[in-house]
């Protein structure tokens, strides 16, 4: 996951032309520090401590230019712990900056806000009004709180061995990696979903507190394996259900998550599984999309959504019946043509050879081939038909005695297919091929006897 986060950061820098990802590279004053107030405020004023544009520190940046802004105070959450950064705006008089990425520098003291100056001029020393995109922040909070509930539900259903192995929290989208030794069953997934949604519907208070790490451990707070923590830690609690060390942003009540839906579960490494899930508006979008699919399918089958499963079972049974009828008709057609084909056979080195172009479907051709292979043990048959797309389908079968005599359907069909612009192959007793030149088919079939003669000696 760490590598994936690095890749995302690189993509962000490439997309935005962001600069200032390490204060040392920018020549920024290492004594600079940004105070984060975004846990309790989505709007705040911050003084511009430094500006970077085109890879260099500068005193002012004009409209149309990309910029990285360092403030003394910010409500913008910087990407960390698997949670994506806040977006939003900064403004001062007629100056407006659109912020689309926020990162911390190497030691985490400086917040680097990257974006584009949309209008006016931003200068070092300006006081900017910072406004976080509230709707997006709320969607991210829904996902992050749901992630905590998901981990608790997984431990209840799968066992206490489940531990977080990584996560990515975006707007109404959850990606959660966890330790487990097997794929989850549909029943387990449904049970986990049910537990999470029941906790959401309970409307439990979500509290965040800072406390000494030893006190947090006594409370049973779960920590991320391998993570280093300071003496004072931030603890997030959802009622009495979940308690974890966490520096991310959260809802104040589980009910605000809306609903929770797992959309996939898969392996990402030995002993590590990954769940992708949706909350809030993305859950609603998925629900509406699937409801439309359900309604459209029901309409196509001339039934109601309530009776769709029963109608689908009926259609499947009807198709099975029609398939049986088609198979029966194909067999009858094959039987009718069999004697005509056998009468046209030629002897080649003791093997009965048939080469014929059929005006039938590929299915009928296969039925004829199966019968010929079974009844004409000492025979080889090359059959061909041209489909509606003017493409040739070829089939070669060889009876068991013909195979013993040296016949090989795969080798025969390969040579014949070459003559009509195609290729193919297969087993000694059965092989298929295709061709792209229908105008060459008659010539190819006329060559079958000589091809067999070259193989059966």
Give short role names for the model-derived ranges.
Residues 1-457:
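A glycine- and charged-residue-rich anion-binding loop/surface
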């Amino acid at each position: 996951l760490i590598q994936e986060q690095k890749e995302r950061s690189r993509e962000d820098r490439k997309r935005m032309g962001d600069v200032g990802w390490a204060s040392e590279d920018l020549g920024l004053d290492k004594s600079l520090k940004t105070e984060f107030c975004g846990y309790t405020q989505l709007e705040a004023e911050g003084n511009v401590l430094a500006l970077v544009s085109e890879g260099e520190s500068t005193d002012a940046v004009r409209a149309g230019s990309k910029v990285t802004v360092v403030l003394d105070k910010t409500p913008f959450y910087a990407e960390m712990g698997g949670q994506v950064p806040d977006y939003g705006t900064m403004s001062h008089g007629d100056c407006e900056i659109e912020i689309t990425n926020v990162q911390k520098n190497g030691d985490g003291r400086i917040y680097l806000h990257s974006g584009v100056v949309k209008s006016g001029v931003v200068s070092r020393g300006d006081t900017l009004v910072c406004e976080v995109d509230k709707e997006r922040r709320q969607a991210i909070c829904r996902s992050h709180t749901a992630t905590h509930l998901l981990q608790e539900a997984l431990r209840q259903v799968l066992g206490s061995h489940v531990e977080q192995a990584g996560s990515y929290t975006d707007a109404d989208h959850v990606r959660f990696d966890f330790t487990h030794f097997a794929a989850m069953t549909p029943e387990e997934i449904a049970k986990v979903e049910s537990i999470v949604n029941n906790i959401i519907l309970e409307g439990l208070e979500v509290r965040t507190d800072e406390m000494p790490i030893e006190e947090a451990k006594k409370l049973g707070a779960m920590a991320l394996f391998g993570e280093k923590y300071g003496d004072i830690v931030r603890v997030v609690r959802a009622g009495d259900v979940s308690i974890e060390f966490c520096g991310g942003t959260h809802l104040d009540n589980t009910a605000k998550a809306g609903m929770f839906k797992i959309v996939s579960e898969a392996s990402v490494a030995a002993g590590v599984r990954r769940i992708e899930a949706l909350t809030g508006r993305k859950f609603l979008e998925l629900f509406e999309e699937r409801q439309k699919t359900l309604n459209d399918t029901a309409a196509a089958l001339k039934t109601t959504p309530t009776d769709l499963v029963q109608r689908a079972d009926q259609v499947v049974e009807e198709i099975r019946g029609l398939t049986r009828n088609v198979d029966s008709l194909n067999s009858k057609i094959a039987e009718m043509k069999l004697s005509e084909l056998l009468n046209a056979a030629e002897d080649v080195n003791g093997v009965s050879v048939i080469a014929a172009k059929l005006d039938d479907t590929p299915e009928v051709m296969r039925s004829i081939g199966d019968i010929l292979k079974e009844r004409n043990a000492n025979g080889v048959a090359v059959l061909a038909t041209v489909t509606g797309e003017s493409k040739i389908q070829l089939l070669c079968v060889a009876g068991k005695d013909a195979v013993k005599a040296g016949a090989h359907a795969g080798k025969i069909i390969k040579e014949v297919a070459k003559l009509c612009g195609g290729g193919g192959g297969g087993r000694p007793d059965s092989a298929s091929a295709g061709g792209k030149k229908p105008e060459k088919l008659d010539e190819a079939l006329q060559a079958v006897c000589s091809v067999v003669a070259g193989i059966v000696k």
